[in-house]
C-alpha cells in the first residue's frame, strides 16, 4: 500500500511541474516591442511569418492578425478527444497576434488556441497557455523583433560639409 501511495504521489507531483518561463512579461503572454515601427509594417511581418509556417490568414488588420492551421497526427486526435467528440471537425491551431502603437513603437503579443466545430455548429475553443508553449512563442517573437530592429534603416548623420552649408 505504501508503494502505491508513493507512486501515485510522485505521478501527481511530476504532472504539476512546469518548465520555467524564459522571460517574464506583463501580460503573461509572449510579447515584443518593435522600435520606430508602423502598425502596417508589423502586421505584414506577422502575415509573412504565418504564411512561411503553413498557416492561413483568417483576419489581418492593423491591430490584429489571426492565423490558423488544420492540425494533423496524434496532436489532432488528442485535441479532438479533449475538446470535441467523434463528430467534430478536425481541430485547428489558431494564433492571434495583437498589435498596439505606443509612442513611436509597436507592441505585439501572441495567444495560442485550439478550436473545433461540434456536430450542430457549436464552436469549442481552448487557450493553450503553459510555460512550454509561451517559451516557444517568446523565442519566435524575439527572433522576429531582433530581425526587424537590426534591419531597419538608420538615418545617416549629416557630413561635415553638409553642416557647413
Task: Describe the role of every protein-language-model region.
Residues 12-15:
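C-terminal motif of bacterial Sec signal peptides marking the signal peptidase cleavage site
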Residues 2-7:
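Sec-dependent signal peptide recognition
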Residues 17-165:
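Ser/Thr-rich, low-complexity intrinsically disordered terminal regions
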Residues 9-10, 43:
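Residue-level signal for mature regions of secreted extracellular proteins and peptides
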Amino acid at each position: 500500500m505504501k508503494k502505491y501511495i508513493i507512486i501515485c504521489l510522485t505521478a501527481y507531483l511530476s504532472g504539476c511541474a512546469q518548465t520555467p518561463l524564459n522571460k517574464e512579461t506583463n501580460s503573461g503572454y509572449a510579447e515584443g516591442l518593435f522600435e520606430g515601427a508602423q502598425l502596417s509594417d508589423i502586421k505584414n511581418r506577422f502575415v509573412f511569418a504565418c504564411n512561411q509556417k503553413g498557416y492561413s490568414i483568417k483576419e489581418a488588420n492593423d491591430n490584429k492578425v489571426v492565423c490558423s492551421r488544420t492540425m494533423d497526427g496524434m496532436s489532432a486526435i488528442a485535441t479532438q478527444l479533449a475538446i470535441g467528440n467523434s463528430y467534430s471537425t478536425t481541430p485547428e491551431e489558431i494564433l492571434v497576434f495583437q498589435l498596439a502603437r505606443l509612442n513611436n513603437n509597436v507592441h505585439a503579443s501572441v495567444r495560442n488556441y485550439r478550436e473545433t466545430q461540434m456536430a450542430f455548429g457549436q464552436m469549442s475553443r481552448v487557450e493553450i497557455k503553459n510555460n512550454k508553449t509561451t517559451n516557444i512563442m517568446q523565442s519566435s517573437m524575439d527572433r522576429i523583433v531582433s530581425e526587424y530592429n537590426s534591419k531597419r534603416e538608420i538615418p545617416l548623420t549629416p557630413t561635415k560639409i553638409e553642416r557647413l552649408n
